[in-house]
Amino acid sequence: MEATDQEVMLEGREDLMSTSATSSTNGGDTNGCGKKLSVTSPDPTPYVTKQRVTRPTPPAPSKNPMQFVQIKPCNLYQTAQEQLKKAEEVKKLKEVKKEEPEEWQNNLDNWKSSRRKRVEHIIDRAVETKKLELEEHDRLRRKSKTFTEMMEERAERGGPRGRAKLASLAVYNEDETNDLSDLGIGTSSASGKSSLSGDYDNNSVMSDHAAELDKAIGAASSVAAGVTAQNVDEQLNHINRNGSNGNHGNGAAVGQTGPSNSSKSAGRQYISSPGYDTSSSNAQASSPDLCEYTYEGAIQDYKQRVQRASSNGNGNANGKLIGEHIAYPTRRGSKIEDRLSGFEVTSPSDTQEGVEKQKVDVPKVDISKRKEIFEQAKAEVSNGGAPAAPKLVFRDGLTNGNSATTAPKSEVRRLSGDISSIRDRMQSLEQQRKAFSSSKSVDVPVPPLKQRLNSLQQSVAKEEQKKPPLVALIDARQLEIMRGEEERMRQQQQKEKHSPSQTTLCAPKPAPPALIIEEPPVADTNDDSGIQEDTADELQQQQQLNAAIAALALEERQLEEAANAVNQIEAEFDELTDLHPSPLPPSPALPAVQQSLQQPTVAQVPAQAVNQAAAPPLRDMEFSVSCTNNFIEPAKISPCDVNVVAASAVSVSKSGPTPNPTSTPNMVSSSPNCNLRRKPSNEMVHHRNLLKMFKETFQNDDDLKEVCEIVTSPGQFTQIIDFSKRPSNPPIPIPTLLPTSTPIPTQIPRPLGKPPMSPKAVRLASSPKGHINPLSSPTNSGFSPPQFSINGRVEIFNSRQLDKPPTPPAPPKKTVRSEHPLKEAVPSPEVVMCAPPMTIVDPDELPKPNTVKALSNCFSQSDSKSLTSPIMSPKPLPSGRIPQITPPASPKPPKRVQLDEVDRSSGDYAPVVGQTKAIVHTPPSKINARANQTLDPLAPNDSLCLHTSSPSEIPSLKACSPNESSLFKLASSRPTSPSVDVASCQKFLNREAPKDIQLAEEDRKRMDQFAVEEMPCDKIDVTKSPQPNTGFQIVTEDLVKKCDGKNISEAVRDLDVPPSQEDIALCAGLLDCLAPAQEPICDSIDVRNGPVPATGFQDISEEEVKKCEKHNKNYVITNRPSSPIGSVRAAHSKALMDTCEQIIAEERKASSQMMKTSLPESVEKPSTPLPGRKSKIPIPKPCCISASGTDSISRAGYVPTAPSHLSGSAQQPLIARTHVVETEIKVKEISPPSIPKTPEQTQLHASPTKEKKAKNIFDFLRRNFGHQEEPQHHSTLNETLEKKVVLTSTKSGVDVVNADEFVRVDNSKFYLASELEDVPVPPPLPKTPAPVNIEIRKKITTNEILEENTTEQALTQEISDLLDDEIMKLEN
C-alpha cells in the first residue's frame, strides 16, 4: 500500500523530477537486471519505478544508460517532505493533547455551574426556612424564658458552685439558619461574618483552648456511651446527681471544672469553635476564614457534626441544655455562607450587646422535653414542695398500696399539654399501659371510684382546655350505648307496671336496679331516686357498686391489651375520656363479684350489675373510646360445652320529661340523675344534640303504631336482657312469659359477643355443669385477659379551628340500616359475629359511602328460610335546628342479629363497620308466653327474659377478597396495597383468634360439610370452549329437500323440468324462515371456523343480488315501472327541475339590472369579479339541474359586459357600496301526488300552475336577488364549477332514490342498481310538477356611502317592502 502511494505521488510529480526512467542503478548490478531495483542512498524511503505490467520486460542493455543519472528526488526535497510529515503528525498529536484538558475543564465547569443552579433555590429555601424558624423560636423564647429562669434558680440553690456552673455554660451565638446540615446540604457553619472586624482568626481560639476541647469531646463521648444504656428513670436520677455535684454544665466530666472556672475568671471567654461565636467573649467577632474548601475538611466536618448531633441528643435526654463543644477544622467562607451572612450583617456602630441580641440562640433542644426535665428537677429539689403538674395518668386509682413502686415510673409520663405529636402521645400511652400492666394484678383491691374518676378528670382536663369546641364523629357503637341507656329507663318504667308478672323469671336474686338516665340535664342532684328498690337492700346496692368497679377494672385491662390494635386516632380518644366526673362512694368489691360469679345459678345477677353500673356516666351523649369487649377465653372453647345465655339491648327508647303517659308516680322519681350523673358542659350538650339528630333519623313513625310485643316460637332464638329488679325466687330455668309479635326493628342492634367498652349488656354463661362457655363473656374477671377489638370511635374536634382534623368531619348522617334475618321454628345454626379484615387507608383518601361491601356479603346464610327485614329508607337529616329526641317505638329484640352493622351515611369518610366475632347459637328448648301484655305502643315491652341456648355449627363462609374488607383502620397517612391489607388482616386474625380450639367430631364434620373448597382458577380458551346453543339450525339444500318431502327419485325427475325463477325464490325464502330449528348436542366448536347459526333470515350478498337480477330479468323489468314510488319520484323530480331552472334563469336575467342599480357606471368592466357580492343560493337537495344550457348561480357574481338600459338609479352617484346578498332556498315536497292517468291531462294541468309559481318566483328574484345579464354573452359555468346530481330523466337509465322517500312511501320495492348494460329504459316521466313548498330566505347586508339623496335607510326600507310583497304573494 505504501509503494502504491509513492508511485502515485511520483506520477503526479514527474514534472519536478529530472527523469522518469523505469529502473534505477544498483551498486552490485551494473547491468541493471531485474524489474525493480532499489537505490542505495541515505534516504530509506523506497521509491517504486514505473513499469508496464502488460508488456514483457525488454532485454536489459549491456550498459545501463541511466547509470550516471539520479532519478530520485533531491535530498533537500526529501528532507523537506519528511519535515512536513513530522510536522503534521506533531500537530495532530498536539491538537489531541490540547483538546482533552479543555474538554475536561469545560465539563467540570459546566457541572459546577449546573450544580450551583440546581442547588441555589434549595439553599435559598433552606435559608428562608431557617430564618423563619429562628424568628419563631426567638418569639417563643421571649414569650417563655424557661431556660434563663431555671438556670437562675439552680444557681441560687447551688450557691457559689451553682453560679460558677452557670458562668461556665457557653451560650452559642451561631444562627441555626447557618447550619444546613440537617437539610442535607453539607455547608460550612462558620457564620460569624460580622462587620465588627475582618481580621479575626478562629485559630487563636482553637489554639488557646485545645486542651479544653479535647476534654469536652472526651466527656461528650463518654456521656453518650453511658446514656444509651440507661432507662428514663436512670436518666432523671443522673440529672439530679449532676445538679448536686455541680457538673451540670456543658456536658463535661468532673475534670472540666478547672477549665470552666478559669474561663469564668477570664470574663467568660468560652470555648469557641469555628461555627460558634461566644455571646459575651472579650474577643472580637470572628470573620470567615479564607482557606479553600476541601473534601477532606468536609468529610471531617461531617463526621464531627454527626458526633455532635449524637452527643447533643443524649445530652438533651440527660438534661444537658447546651451541646458539647466540638473542635472544627479551620474552614473559610463559601458562597453559601456569603448568602447566609446576609441575614446577620450589622453596622459597625452596633454594640456587643446588639450583636448578642441579634445572634443569641439556644442549642437544639426539644422544648417539651426541656420543660418537662426542669419541672421534674424542680419538683425533686424542692423536697416535697408543691406537686408537679398532673401527668397523663388513667389508672392512678388502681395502684392503691403500690404507689411507692409506681412513683418512679410515673416520671416517665409526659405532660399532656406538652405532647407535640400523635406519635409521641401514642408512645406515652403505651408506656403508661406497660407500666400499669407490670405493676397491676387482678387481685389488687380496687380503690374508690371517686379517686379514679378524679384522676381521670385531672389527666384530661388540661388537654381538654386546649381543645376547640367539640364536634363528634359517632358510629353505631356509640348510638348503641345511647340506646342502651334509654332502654334501661324504659325497662324501669315497664318494670313498674309489670312487676307482679316478673316473678317467674330465671333469677335467684333480685336483679340490680337499672340506671335510669334522662336526656335533658334536669338537675345536678346525685341521689339514688332513679334506682327502684322494693326494700332498702343495702347488700344489693353494695353489689351494684362492686359490679361497677369490677367492670371498670375489666375495661382498663382491655385498654391495656388494645395498645397494639388501636390506631393513632384512638390515642386521642383515650385522652378525651371524660370532662366532669362525679365521685362515687368507695366499695372494694371485686372479691365479692368473683364469689358471686363462681356460682352458675347466680351468674346472671353480677352480669347485670356490670351491665348497669359499669356504663359510663351520662355526659349528655358524650362517650369515651368506643371499643368492644371480646369475652373469650382462648383456653376453653368448646361449642358443645354449655348453654349460652345471650343478652343484648337493641332498642332505643323514647326519652322525655314523661316518656310514658301512663307511668306511675314512681316513674317520676326515675328522672333525676343517678349516682353516675355529671354536670353537662357546652360540649356535652352539643354532643347530645348531635346524637339526637341522628336518633331522629332512625325513628320511623310506623314503629310507634305497632304493638310492642314479641312473638317467640320454640324454634326462635332471642337475645334480650332484663334490667328490671327481680325478687329472689327459686330459679326457674325457662321463663313463662312470651311476647306475641315482632315488629321490624329499625334501630341498630348491638353486635353479639362484643359489648362496648362500658358494657350495657354482658353475656354470662349459666351452666349447670359449672363450666364457662368461651364464646360467651367470662364469668370471672380474674381469668385470662379478654381479647379486645376496635369497633367504633369518637373524635371530638372543631373542624373550623383545626388546620387538618385527624379524621374527616362528620357529614349529615343517614339512618344506619341493618338486616335482621328472622328464623322459622326449625332450629338452624347461626353465625352471630365474625372478625372482618382490616384495610389501612388515609383519612383524606377514604372511599365514598356505599363503595365498601358489608361484611355480611362474605357469609352465606345456611338457613334458606330466614327472612330479611326490609331496610328502611333513611330520612334526610333536618338542618337548621337541633331537634329534640322524638322516641320511636321500642324495637323488639331480633331473633337474630346480622353479622355486622354498616353505617351507610352519606359523607366523605368510609362507613364504620362493627367488628364482630362468630358466636353460634341454637334455639332455646322452650319458651312460654308472657302474661299481662300491654297495648301501649310507648310502653317498654322488652324487659328481657334470659333464655338459654346451646352453640351449634358454624355455617359455610364465602371467599372474601381483600378489596371487600369492611373495617377501616386509620393507622398511617398513606393507603396500602391489597397485599399489605391481607397481611395485616391475617396478622390481626391470628392474634385475635382463640387458641387451642377443640371442636367436637360432629361439629368438625358439619364445618367440613359447609366449608367451601377454593380451587385455583384454570385458564380457559374461549375459542376452544363449546358455544352455547342458539336454538337455530343451518338450512342446507338437503334439509330443504327433506322438509319438502321429496325423495331422491322425485328430485331427479324434477331436474328435468327447470323450475321458474319465481318459484325458486319463493321456496328458498319460505324454507329459510320456516325450517324447524333442531338443537344439536353441544360440542366443541371453533367460533372462527364454525358455520353461522341459522337465525331464520337469509344473508343476501351483492353477488346473489346480481345473480337474482340476471335470472329474474324479465320479472324485475315488469315490476319496476309499476312501483308507486317510480311515478311519484318522476313527477316530483320534474317539478323540482322546472322550478329550479326558472329560479336560476331569472336570477341570471336580473343580475345586470341589480348591478346597475347598486354601482355607478364608471366601474363597469367586462367580466370583472365582484368579491363583495356573493350569491349564496344553494342547489336544493331534492332537485337537480339538468344540462339544459341554463347558467348556474355562480354566474351571478360577475358584472355584465353589456351596458344596461336600466340606468335610472345611476343618476345618483355612489362613492362606494358593498352589497352582499345571502339567499337560501329550501324546496320541500308536501305529499306525493297520485300517478297521473294520461300525459295529456297532466300537461294541460301543468301549464297554469307553472306560470303562476314561476311568475311569483320570477318577480321575487328579479326585484330583490338577480343581476340582469344576457345569457348569450357568457358561457355557462356550472359544468366546470361543480358537478350536478342528475336524477332520473327520459334519457337516463339511472334510478336514484332519495333517502326521504324510503320512509314516506309505503308498499314500495327498491332494487339495487344492476351493472348490466341491457337494462331497458323506463317509460318517460310525466310532466306534472309535484306540489312543493319552496321556502326562500334572504339576508341582505348593504354598506354604502351615498353622495346625494339616496340613504342607507331608504334603500333598506325599499328592500324590506319588496321582500314583504313577494312573501305575501307566495303565501297567497
From Swiss-Prot:
InterPro entries named among the record's database cross-references: DUF4757
Molecular-function GO terms, alphabetical: microtubule binding
Gene Ontology cellular component list: cell-cell junction; cytoplasm; zonula adherens
Compositional bias of kind Low complexity: 184-198, 238-251, 514-523, 652-673
A biological-process GO annotation: actin cytoskeleton organization
Residue ranges the record marks as coiled coil: 75-143, 409-438, 539-580
Region ranges (Disordered): 1-67, 178-199, 238-287, 380-414, 427-447, 486-531, 652-679, 799-820, 860-897, 1151-1181, 1231-1250
Record keyword Coiled coil present: yes
Biased composition (Basic and acidic residues): 486-499
Superkingdom of origin: Eukaryota
Composition bias, Polar residues: 17-28, 257-287, 399-408, 860-871, 1151-1160
Keywords: Coiled coil
Tagged with keyword Coiled coil: yes
Protein name as it appears in the record: Uncharacterized protein CG43427
UniProt organism field: Drosophila melanogaster
